[in-house]
Amino acid sequence: MTAIHPTATRAYLTLPYAYTLAQELSASERQPLHQRKREPLAAAVLAAVHAVGYAVPTVQHWRDLADAANLSETLLGMGVFTEPEAQSLFADAVAAVVDLGRKHGHGQEMRLNAVQLGHLVEFGEAYGQVLEVIPARTFIRAHRATERRLRELLVNSHGSDTHEFIVV
């Protein structure tokens, strides 16, 4: 079992971003990510949801869910989704993913109650749909902004009680 560490080392801050600014600027403003890029992302989230609900979830499943939840949170902040239902769905998914991480950190099984699992199932389906419709440039911009936001939180929130960091 991989341990959850409450803090991240500064080495995390020196890792390269997944996408470069050049990739962001050259990505399509109208077309979504290519199918070969978005399908593995959507499939990983659906596999993680399935593992949480019906199998034995691993740390990698949690990471896939956390990545999707963090990216969705950034997309909400960018104003990509303005519908209250979408905002509620993504907020519920983030809460469920945090709960899974806490449970793992305390040596408990990564399981959710029926309501949380329902939110996570909805989120998994919605995430795949989002990837099919948002332009590639928006996705890459959100991905870069998410990485930047998480790094800033790690640097600026040392000793803060406002954020809980679960790094696995």
What are the language-model segments listed below?
Residues 1-13:
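Short, positively charged, Ser/Thr-rich terminal linear motifs in low-complexity/disordered regions
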Residues 51-64, 105-122:
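Short, low-complexity cationic-aromatic patches
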Residues 109-168:
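Amphipathic alpha-helical binding modules
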Residues 14-56, 85-109, 148, 152, ...:
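Short, flexible domain-boundary/linker segments around small modular repeats
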Residues 66-99, 125-146, 150:
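Extended intrinsically disordered, low-complexity coil regions enriched in Ser, Thr, Gly, Ala
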